[in-house]
Amino acid sequence: MRRAERRVAGGSGSGSPLLEGRRSTESEVYDDGTNTFFWRAHTLTVLFILTCSLGYVTLLEETPQDTAYNTKRGIVASILVFLCFGVTQAKDGPFSRPHPAYWRFWLCVSVVYELFLIFILFQTVQDGRQFLKYVDPRLGVPLPERDYGGNCLIYDADNKTDPFHNIWDKLDGFVPAHFIGWYLKTLMIRDWWMCMIISVMFEFLEYSLEHQLPNFSECWWDHWIMDVLICNGLGIYCGMKTLEWLSLKTYKWQGLWNIPTYKGKMKRIAFQFTPYSWVRFEWKPASSLHRWLAVCGIILVFLLAELNTFYLKFVLWMPPEHYLVLLRLVFFVNVGGVAMREIYDFMDELKPHRKLGQQAWLVAAITVTELLIVVKYDPHTLTLSLPFYISQCWTLGSILVLTWTVWRFFLRDITMRYKETRRQKQQSHQGRAINNGDGHPGPDDDLLGTGTAEEEGSTNDSVPAEKEGASAAS
């Protein structure tokens, strides 16, 4: 059994729900506690294989006399040794399926990628671009200029053979990429409103920055119909349906060899690629100021990571179809889900000394480093001023958001406290009026009432005393 499961399942009996420390948004988990070879640590096995491999290269393989080849091979070998160490020794994250080692691997890849970005950041612009030739000799060449936007007619009457040719031209490989991307982003964020806000805001960013990057120039129907409504919207819808299924699913796990039927074994293998448990994200941005700022920060980092995809291709001279661009997207898909879960746990944690998760920390560092590379490698493009009407729109939007923030978390609270104080005072005055009206002593009559009661008490006490004296005399 993996370390994450063993930590949660400690003290629970066979087939019992793991309720200890479970949040209200977290599903119940039933686990029989099976500990198989698949889940055990293999630190000695990995160390033995690594030692044998290095020994073979050192003792039995002749070293080539090619300096460039040896340099590349040495760098790759160093990275592989680090990955072997990290996969076996790094700390587990919040996810454990299909295997904790899978997520430890991507954590180590995050470290390698961040170090690579730092190296690129400390090079000159020319050296940094030419260094990529060591990765792929086809890189390091200025990108050819392309025509974006163009004819935006949905129905082109001048084209008799195919009047809808503009639509067919837009149906390329990026259409399924948009759908799959937003489906996976929805699984990361787990909130419909946040996904739609990010989707719409990115289209506004493309409108605003098309004077800097030509590939942001698209037709209006490409922005709002094909991207937001069809590709992004359909991906978000399918993602929300998947989240609904995951939140209702029963999480009951048995060891593979404890399942008697082959059908059950195959089903258990397939479910190995589903979550071990499920936590429903309740971001509640309007509940407090720190949650509101945190959600705004998450949206900004998401948008910044999206923009970095296009700006890095532009400043590092990478064609959009290059495999490095695809590998970066695959990387963010794998690390983004872990980072979002760690951020949510960080926001939900009630301890005074909270600690941001390791993967979330690395994703934030990577996003900022990518931005710094863009700023260093092409400051001229980034400093191209926004058109006046666009800057006015962003200024107005910023003022509206700031005004709502001040009203919601400052003025509204002051107003509510003032109204509550007035309500309490009115209730107090009404209580006094009622007490004075029905004959009961009010708050101002306490002292007077007490004195009268004492006088009456002393008078009543003297009457029996006089009667007792008279009877004794007789």
Swiss-Prot record:
It comes from the Eukaryota. Its main location: endoplasmic reticulum. The chain crosses the membrane at residues 41-61, 75-95, 105-125, 292-312, 314-334, 355-375, 382-402. Pfam families: PSS. Coiled coil: none annotated. Keywords: Endoplasmic reticulum, Glycoprotein, Lipid biosynthesis, Lipid metabolism, Membrane, Phospholipid biosynthesis, Phospholipid metabolism, Phosphoprotein, Transferase, Transmembrane, Transmembrane helix. Inhibited by excess phosphatidylserine, but not by phosphatidylcholine nor phosphatidylethanolamine. One of its GO terms (cellular component) is endoplasmic reticulum membrane. One of its GO terms (molecular function) is L-serine-phosphatidylethanolamine phosphatidyltransferase activity. Glycans are attached at residue 159. The keyword Endoplasmic reticulum applies. Residues 1-25, 422-474 are annotated as: Disordered. The modification Phosphoserine is found at residues 12, 14, 16. The keyword Glycoprotein applies. It is found in: Endoplasmic reticulum membrane; Membrane. Catalyzes a base-exchange reaction in which the polar head group of phosphatidylethanolamine (PE) or phosphatidylcholine (PC) is replaced by L-serine. Catalyzes the conversion of phosphatatidylethanolamine and does not act on phosphatidylcholine. Shows a substrate specificity for phosphatatidylethanolamine and does not act on phosphatidylcholine. Can utilize both phosphatidylethanolamine (PE) plasmalogen and diacyl PE as substrate and the latter is six times better utilized, indicating the importance of an ester linkage at the sn-1 position. This is Phosphatidylserine synthase 2.
